[in-house]
Amino acid sequence: MPVKPSAQNNSPSKPTSKSVPVDSDSLVIGDAIYHLADHTPMMVQYLNMKVNYPQALLLYRMGDFYELFFEDAKRAAQILDITLTRRGTDKAGNTIAMAGVPFHAADSYMARLIAAGQTVVVCEQIDESATGTDNANNPSNAPTMGDKQKKDKSKSTAGTIMRREVVKTLTAGTITDDALIAPNHTPTVVAIDIETPKSNSKQPVQAAVSQMDLAAGTLTTQTISANQDDIESLQTQMLTVLARFAPSECIISEALSDSNGDISEEWLLWLRQHLNCPIIEVAANDFHREHASATLCQQFEVQRLDGLGISGAPLAQSSCAALIHYARQTQQRHVPQLNQLIVEYNDDYLIIDANSQQNLELFTPVSSNGTSLISVLNHCQTPMGRRLLVQQMKRPLRQHSRINLRLDAITSLLDTDKQSEQCSGNISLVTSLRETLNAIGDIERISSRIGLMSAKPRDLRKLADGIASSAQLTTLLTNAGISHEQAGLLPMLMQQLPAQLPAVQSVAELIERAIIVEPPAHIRDGGMLAAGYDAEFDRLTHLHDNIQVTLDEMVERARQESQLPSLKVGFNKVSGFYFELPKMQAKNAPAHFIRRQTLKSSERFITNELKTVETEYLSAQSLALTREKQLYNELLIRLGSHLAELQQLSAAIAQIDVLNNWAQLAITYNWQRPVMSNESKKSSILDNSLENSHSENGLNNNSQTSINIKEGRHVVVEAVLNPIHTHQNNPAKHSSHFVANDCVLGSYENPERLLMITGPNMGGKSTYMRQTALIVLLAHCGSFVPAARAHIGDIDRIFTRIGSADDLAGGKSTFMVEMIETANILNQATNKSLVLMDEVGRGTATTDGLAIAHACVNRLVEIGCLTLFATHYFELTKLAQNPKESSGSNDKFIRNVHVAASEIDGQLLLLHQIKDGAASSSFGLHVAKMAGIPIQVLNDAKRYLVDNLSIDNLKPDNESIDDDKNELAKSVKDKRQQTYDSNIEKSNIRNLDKKQKNIDIPQQNQLFSLQDELQAIDPDSLTPKQAHDLLYHLKEIISY
C-alpha cells in the first residue's frame, strides 16, 4: 500500500507545502521550482529524493560528509551555527547553497536538529561491491548508516552516478539511538483521530489518542467522547490524556487540515495551541478506518482484534494503525518490536492534569534552581527502571488491589532486609539488588535496536552482560526466601528472569560466542566477531593476518611432495607471489609449476594454488569485512526472533528496580506503608451522618472518600533540608528536621471535608497543602509514604490552584489564568477528588476577590470533595464558625486550621505547625521586613494601617446589620457604596467628631515621628543641658 512521507507543518496558518512534478523536467519543492535540465546528474539525484521529503532536512552522503543543499542548507546552518557555503551554480546561474557535517560526528549534529523540532532524513551511499552480499540477507535491503565509504566525487565509476538510498527518517518521537536521545527523556509519538457527527445528529463527538513508544515496543490508546454541545469536556479529557502521554511529536491526518469544515479548523487550531511538540500531517490513507483492522492484525500476527481489546473502537484502530505506518516509514522497514497494545481508561488511574503536575513540581521545578519530586525519588539503577518510575508517577493507580500488590512486594523486600541486618556481616537484600541492577544496561532500547537492525556490537555485549547480571537477581531473591512459585508481584517477576526463560539464556550464549569481549563502537571497520564463530571468516582473517605462515606451510608441503629442498617463496609488486628454484633444480619442477620468470641463477614459477592465495591475500581484508558484516546482520536476525522474551526480561528488571527504589527510599527517609481502603473506623455511622447532612442540602454523596494522615512530611522539602546521597549503593539514614503535621478529612473523628487554612506568609500553608497531595500521589503509585500513618480512601483526581503566572502570549492576565484553573476545578471535581486551592481571588480587587472565594468555598462544599483552602480573607473563617454565614449548614463540613506563629520582641517566629482554629493575623508587615523592604516603606505601611484601623474603630455599633444571614455579603461591599438612612448618618458624623478629638490622624503621624526620635537618642552620651532641652522638645510634640 503506497504511503505518503511524513511532513512537518511549521506554519499553523499555512497548509503543508506539497511537492509535485510540474512536468517531466521540473519539480516543485516547497515554494521553489527546479528545472532538472539546469542541474548536474548528481543534483538531479538529490532533487528526486528531496521531492519526497519537502519539509524534512535531507542529509545527503557525499564521501566523508553529509551535505545539505538549497533551503535545507540555510536552515541547518542557522540551527547548527555551521558555515554556509555554495556548490557553484546551476546552468541558469542560480547559486546552490550548501552546508555539511562530517559523518563521523553526525550523531551530535542530528541530535541538535531533532531537538530544534526538525525531521532529519538520512541518505546513504550504496557501495555495491561491499554491500551486495549484505543486501541479499538484509530484510530491509538497506546499508548500515555510518559505514565508512570511498570518497565520493559524485560518480562511483566513469559516467555512473553512485547509488544512494534513504535509510531512515529521524523524528523527535521515533529515535532509538542513545546518542540522539536527551538524558531521562522517552521519545514517543501520539496519533489523534477525531470523529465529529453531523450537526443534526445526536451522536456524541468521539476522539482517540494513541501513543507509540518505539523503544519499549508498546502502543497505548484511549478513546474519549462528549456531547456535541460540550466540546470543552472532550478537550479537557484530551488534555488529561496528553499530559499522561507527554508526546515528543503528534501526527494527525492531512484530511483534518484539508477539510473545509469549521469544526476541523477549530480542532486543528486548538491542537496547535495546546500541544508543545511538532504536529506532523500524514497521508489520510494512514488513518483509513477500513484498512486499520488489517494493519493491526498483520502487525500483531492475529486473525481478529477481539483479543486486543479494540475490536469495537474504530478510532482507536485507525490511530494505532497510523502509528504503525509512521514507524515503518521512518524506520524504512517493518517494526517487529512493536508487539504490545495497551487500552487505557480514565477510571484506571488517579488523574493529575498538566497544571497540577506543574504546580506540584512533579517533573520540572517552577524555578530554575528548584527541585522536582522526580529528582528526589528517581534513584533507580537501570535506565528502564528510571523510565518506568516516571510512567508510574504519570499513571497513579486507582484500584487498591493493584496498589496493594506493589506495597506487598516492597514490604517483602523490607522484611527480608531487616532480617539481613540482624545477621552480622550480611549485606542487606535491598543493597545487594541495587549493586546488581547497577550493572545492567538498557536492555529495552538495545532490544528495540535489534528489531530495527541498528544495534551496534557494544549493544550486544551490554545485552549479554545484562542477561548474566539479571540471572543474579533470581539468586538474590531466592536466597532471601522469595520463590517464583509463590503468589505476589515479586514471584511473578521472577518468572520472567533468565532462570525461567531458556530463550534468553540462549541469546546470551550466542552473543558470547559471536562477539569479542571489547568490540569496536561501530561495524564499519569490522573487528567485532570472535574467533571460532564462522570457519570462512576465520580463514579469511587468518589468511590476511598470517600470510607468511600460510606461505611457509605451502612451501613445506611442496618440498615434501616434489622433493625440492631448495624451494623458496617470494613476492614483488610486478609478479606477485612466486616459487623460486635454483637452475640445477628447475628441471625437476612438477608439471603444475608454471614458469613465470628466468633469472641468471634461478627460475620463478607460479601455481594455481599460489595464485589463489595471492588473490585471496590481496582481497582478504575486503572479503573479511564483507563476510563479517553479513554474519553480523544474520546474527541480528537470529537475535530478533527472541524480541518478545527480551522485552519481558526488560520489563521485569524495570519493575524490580522500581520496587527496590521504593524500598530504599522507605529505609532512608523512614517512610511507612499506607492503608489503601475505602472503609474507616465506624464508617457506617459516618456514612449515615454524611448522607443525612447532605440530603438536607439536596446533595448526592454516595461513595464518599477520606484521608487520614498522621505526621505527614513534604518529600522534597525534607530531602533538601537533609541532603542524602541516595544514588550511592549504601545511603545513610537521616534524622528529619522537618515539622510534621496531620491532615484529616472526611474521617469519623473529623468529618469535615474542607480545611480553611489561614496564617502568615512563609508559614508553610502551601507546603502543607502540597505535602498532602504528594502523599496521596505516592500512595497511589504503590509506594510507602513520608508519614507516621496514612489511611487513603478512593481518590479519583488531584486538582491544584497554587501559584501565579500570566500567559502573555495567550493574552491572559494572572487573574485570568487563576480563574481558568479555578473554573476547571469547579467543573471537573467530584466527591472523590482532592482539591488544593491557595489564595483564590487575590489577583483582583479585595471585595471582588473575597466574594469569589466565598462562592468557591460554597461550591466545593456542595461537591463534597476533599479540599485544602488557604486564604488571607479572614472573613471566610466565619463560614466554619457560624452556620448562618453561608447558604447551608457548611459548618459541618468546614474546619478552621492555621499555621502557628509567634511574635517575640517584634520578630516573627514561624513554627510551621498546623493547629485548630483561625489565625489572628497574616503578619504581612513582618514578612515584608524579613524580605528586606526598606524601613521607610515599612513605617509608611504602619501609618497607613493605623489610619485605616482608626477609621474602622470610629464606626458606631448601630452600623451593623440586623440580618446575620447577610452579614458576610454586606461586609465585602466597598464602604463608599454603603448607604445609611439619614438618622444613622447624622449619628455617625457626631460620633466621629467626638472621637477625632482623642484620635487625630496628624497627631498619630507626630507619634510615629516621636518614636523615631526616641530610638535615635543615646542617653549615655547626652549632657545635662542637652537632656533638659530634649525634654522640652518632647513635651511640645506631645502637646501638639
Swiss-Prot record:
GO BP of this protein: mismatch repair
Domain of life where this protein originates: Bacteria
Keyword field: ATP-binding, DNA damage, DNA repair, DNA-binding, Nucleotide-binding
Annotated positions binding ATP: 759-766
Compositionally biased residues, Polar residues: 1-10, 130-143
Record has DNA repair as a keyword: yes
Pfam family, one: MutS_V
SUPFAM superfamilies (alphabetical): DNA repair protein MutS, domain I, DNA repair protein MutS, domain II, DNA repair protein MutS, domain III, P-loop containing nucleoside triphosphate hydrolases
Molecular function GO labels: ATP binding; ATP-dependent DNA damage sensor activity; damaged DNA binding; mismatched DNA binding
SMART domains given in the database record: MUTSac (SM00534), MUTSd (SM00533)
PROSITE patterns assigned: DNA_MISMATCH_REPAIR_2
Cellular component GO terms, alphabetical: cytosol
Disordered: annotated segments: 1-22, 130-157
Gene3D superfamilies: 1.10.1420.10, 6.10.140.430, DNA repair protein MutS, domain I, MutS, connector domain, P-loop containing nucleotide triphosphate hydrolases
Residue spans of biased composition, Low complexity class: 11-22
HAMAP family: MutS
Record's function text: This protein is involved in the repair of mismatches in DNA. It is possible that it carries out the mismatch recognition step. This protein has a weak ATPase activity.
Family in the record: Belongs to the DNA mismatch repair MutS family.
Protein name: DNA mismatch repair protein MutS
Annotated organism of origin: Psychrobacter cryohalolentis (strain ATCC BAA-1226 / DSM 17306 / VKM B-2378 / K5)
Biological classification of the source: Bacteria, Pseudomonadati, Pseudomonadota, Gammaproteobacteria, Moraxellales
